[in-house]
Amino acid sequence: MSIFDRLKNVAEKTAKDAARSVGNTIGTKRETFTFSALPESLAEMQALPEAKLDTPFATAALTVLALCAYAADRATGTEMLNWLRGPRPLNGQDISFLNDRFRDGKTYLPFTYFAGSTPDNNYTPAQPYKVTIESNHVSAEEQGYMKLFIPCGGADSPRPIKLRQRGSDGKWFLWEQYLLTGVRTP
């Protein structure tokens, strides 16, 4: 094994140990975010305190709001999602996926993540709007990424969302979301 390979192995081990350490620090955590109203424009979203994008939990909560906006108005929702994705905007495949998920009147899907939203009440959330974001022991396994979970009123288990931290300023951006999968029909 060359000197370069040994140094590379040490660096990789150090990075993995650091990621595990962050994961152990994060552990199982729950954060609930409360919104008096849903933003109807990117400017309104950016005016929210969570818009600093300084925690993966805040970015995950804003993603739910952006998906609600997308259900109401695709252009506004796309603008919000692109902002949350940072330097990696939605591509044609992403937009096609979103459009497919909201087809056939399934605009209720993102509302299933708010407290009080159940199939019995047609996924009408309680107000103010509250969304809870959770982490667990595997959330920080991958360095620079955080996999969080959002409880859903229409499913038995929380749904995952993956966020990426930008190294230059520490901001958290949406990387992948699995929030628009099937739920119990209202």
Features from the language model and the residues they span:
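Amphipathic alpha-helical interaction segments
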Residues: 78, 91, 121-122, 131, ...
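Short beta-strand edge/turn micro-motifs at domain boundaries
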Residues: 151-186
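Large, modular interaction/toxin scaffolds in secreted and membrane-associated proteins
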Residues: 4-12, 72, 127, 139
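Surface-exposed, charged secondary-structure patches
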Residues: 96-153
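Glycine- and small hydrophobic-rich membrane-insertion segments that are intrinsically disordered
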Residues: 2-32
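Core segments of small alpha/beta cavity-forming domains
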Residues: 24-115
